[in-house]
Amino acid sequence: MESWVFERGSLTRRLKAACGADFNVRVIRQGFAHPFPDEALLLKLRSGRRALVREVELRSRERRLVLARSVLPAQTLKGAGRRLAHLGNRPLGEILFASRRPRRHGFEAALAEDRHWRPAVRAGSGSAGPVWGRRSLYSIAGRPLLVAEFFLPAVLSVPESA
């Protein structure tokens, strides 16, 4: 699990290499919402500000491997970042790591209790307890975005050498 949590490159690229054509993204929800207080603090958003919040599953066929939550402030969605608001079932990492590497400003890893997740997210996670997660603060063209990824038990069946 450690190599997944501490992957320094594109998690999307690594999963695609390991899963091939079976890799896919399912959007759980996406829309403007109030970020969690700790997310707003990391993104330096003023109280009450909304951001684009996107929650997805990264999967191999129907098997859920990773749950991801991205928070993109409105300022990040301007100019070249406009395309980030219209990803559909495309993975954020595909855009984030395209051409120039994004700048990572912070990284955190921790065990996350699934009891804090919404029931719709928790259902079918395959988790019977805490899962490893990581959170990274990136910037694209000087504008921030926050990405959190939670590694579900099924990710252990994906070859780590990919």
From Swiss-Prot:
<comment type="pathway">
    <text>Cofactor biosynthesis; ubiquinone biosynthesis.</text>
</comment>
<comment type="function">
    <text>Removes the pyruvyl group from chorismate, with concomitant aromatization of the ring, to provide 4-hydroxybenzoate (4HB) for the ubiquinone pathway.</text>
</comment>
<dbReference type="GO" id="GO:0008813">
    <property type="term" value="F:chorismate lyase activity"/>
</dbReference>
<feature type="binding site">
    <location>
        <position position="92"/>
    </location>
    <ligand>
        <name>substrate</name>
    </ligand>
</feature>
<feature type="binding site">
    <location>
        <position position="149"/>
    </location>
    <ligand>
        <name>substrate</name>
    </ligand>
</feature>
<feature type="binding site">
    <location>
        <position position="54"/>
    </location>
    <ligand>
        <name>substrate</name>
    </ligand>
</feature>
<dbReference type="GO" id="GO:0042866">
    <property type="term" value="P:pyruvate biosynthetic process"/>
</dbReference>
<dbReference type="GO" id="GO:0005829">
    <property type="term" value="C:cytosol"/>
</dbReference>
<dbReference type="Pfam" id="PF04345">
    <property type="entry name" value="Chor_lyase"/>
</dbReference>
<keyword id="KW-0831">Ubiquinone biosynthesis</keyword>
<protein>
    <recommendedName>
        <fullName>Probable chorismate pyruvate-lyase</fullName>
        <ecNumber>4.1.3.40</ecNumber>
    </recommendedName>
</protein>
<dbReference type="InterPro" id="IPR028978">
    <property type="entry name" value="Chorismate_lyase_/UTRA_dom_sf"/>
</dbReference>
<keyword id="KW-0963">Cytoplasm</keyword>
<dbReference type="InterPro" id="IPR007440">
    <property type="entry name" value="Chorismate--pyruvate_lyase"/>
</dbReference>
<dbReference type="GO" id="GO:0006744">
    <property type="term" value="P:ubiquinone biosynthetic process"/>
</dbReference>
<keyword id="KW-0456">Lyase</keyword>
<comment type="similarity">
    <text>Belongs to the UbiC family.</text>
</comment>
<keyword id="KW-0670">Pyruvate</keyword>
